[in-house]
Amino acid sequence: AIRGLTDRPRSAISGNSSYTAARIGDVYGVEAGVLLPSVVSDEFPTEAGLDESSETHDIAEPYAVSVGRAGWVKGTWETVSMLAGSGISLAHVGGGAGEDLARLTQHAESCGVGLWVAPRLSSPEMAALIRGARAVVSMAHGEPFGLTPVEAISVGTPALMVDEGGFRDTVIDDVNGRLLPRDDLGAWHSALEQAADGRTRTAWAESGRARIAEMDLSPDAHCRRLESVLDCL
């Protein structure tokens, strides 16, 4: 389908990150530009809003948050395995098939990791959950862009991401979060300890917000970039 599009006159192919654009080139042999996604920033405000609930969820603290439907591609089982022995529980947001969630619960129990599977959350509820977390973590495979670190950084919670995929566009290692080797569990545990330090959290949040502002993921900027692509056709 992509090769067919490139054969059409006045056509352009874009990926939502430098990783996605590179993968399009590797797989299809066609040149692709980068068209960053848009993010509505006020859904994850810097300061807690009045609509954010202070309700304590049924999960032992400290906890980390992972986002995405439970499955291999999101690295959900790997995340639980990584947390074993860390003393950190996991709040899983994104649901999944009933059978998969049952297996995930059994896996967490076998690893001694506390697990809370979140119900459907509103944006304020999601922001509150992330704000109270030690970190937001992801071991996703081939994540095209990854909005999760943007959401975490916006509310001031450390983003600990696997050093792969589109996460490299938003996270600069040890500047505004961490990019970590998938198989180095010691590095992940050290990063989770690092994320507990108040000064580190503040420094990463400030650098992260500056990075997001530099990328300008606003809907208006997205429209301007899309218009620029169309103007070049």
Q: Where does each model-flagged region fall?
A:
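Short hydrophobic beta-strand element within catalytic cores of glycosyltransferases
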Residues: 158-162
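Glycosyltransferase donor-sugar binding loop
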Residues: 67, 88-104, 119
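A charged, aromatic-enriched C-terminal amphipathic alpha-helix characteristic of glycosyltransferases
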Residues: 187, 199-230
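Membrane-proximal helix-turn-helix segments that form the acceptor-binding/catalytic region
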Residues: 1-13, 20-22
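A conserved mid-protein helix/loop that constitutes part of the nucleotide-sugar donor-binding site
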Residues: 62, 69-85, 99-100
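Aromatic "clamp/platform" in nucleotide-sugar-dependent glycosyltransferases that forms part
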Residues: 141
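Nucleotide-activated donor-binding/catalytic signature segment of Leloir-type glycosyltransferases, i.e.
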Residues: 102-124
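Conserved acidic donor-binding segment of nucleotide-sugar-dependent glycosyltransferases
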Residues: 173-174, 178-186, 193-199
